[in-house]
Structures are given as structure tokens and as C-alpha cells.
Amino acid sequence: RTQEILYFIRKIKADNLVTGHGNFPVYVDSPMAVRATSIFQDNISQCFDDAAMELVKQGINPISFPGLNLSITSEESKAINFEETPKVIISASGMCEAGRIRHHLKHNLWRPESTVLFVGYQAVGTLGRAIIEGAKEVRLFGEPIEVRAKIRQFNGLSGHADKNGLVE
């Protein structure tokens, strides 16, 4: 999913669809997603579809662009939350039950100017599900955090095959 999201963000930036913040930074803050992105970069012909390969033929990397930052260390991850500029943070969620996403939620859920976009399934009983179902407050690291950010869900990027995909 991370690579699909990067593909779409590259297009959004290339088409100047974000007015006033065209050069916004994008952080991939998941060590596994960073490794997967590296695999995509090293195996272009096996990983990209026809549309992405057309970009490659034009000398355009379909999942890279100015402002893309790959966060590896925990120090790099923590620093993201202290930058004041508008930004996109792509962080593996684990349904918001563990990992770096919890720190990003702690620093951004209370901010009405923030948007948290879920692109994966959130199981019943998880923090992610509570947030998408409209929780007004959640607990992170033992602290109550008011949910004032805009919460959105995009279901078109499942990381799992559907029934037909499994049969193939």
C-alpha cells in the first residue's frame, strides 16, 4: 500500500493539485515500508504496472519525488512531530495498536487542522476502529487525547487479495 500511496502523491505533486503547499514533505515512517519501497526501486520491471512503467520510460521514478523522506531511526520518527510545516506522514498502523503510528496520533489527533486517513481495515476492538467510528477521546500512552482531527477512510487500497485474487 505504501508504494501505491507514494505513486498517487507523486502524481498529485506533479499536477500541482495542492495549492499553497506544493512542495510539502512526505514521510514514510515505517521501517518495513521503507524496506519494501527499496525492493520496489531495485526491481522496477517486476513491481510496476504498465502505467508506472510508462513513467519509468520517461525517466520518472513513479514512487519518488522531491520532499520524500524515508524515516528509519526512532530519532528521525520522533523529529517528524516537531516540524511545524504541513506534511504527510505514512506510517504502518497495525490498526493503531502498536508502533510509530501511536506517537503520530498522540501529536496530531488533537489538532483540528490535521487529517488522519485510514487506508486499511480496522478490526472491532482496536484503537483504529474506535477512531473511525467517531471516538471523541482516546488514550495513548496512558494519556487522554481529544480527537479533533478530521478522520477519513479510503477503502480502495486493501493490502489483501479479494476472493478472485486468492483463487488466481
Model-derived regions, located:
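Acidic/His-rich, metal-assisted hydrolase cores and their charged scaffolds
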Residues: R1-E168
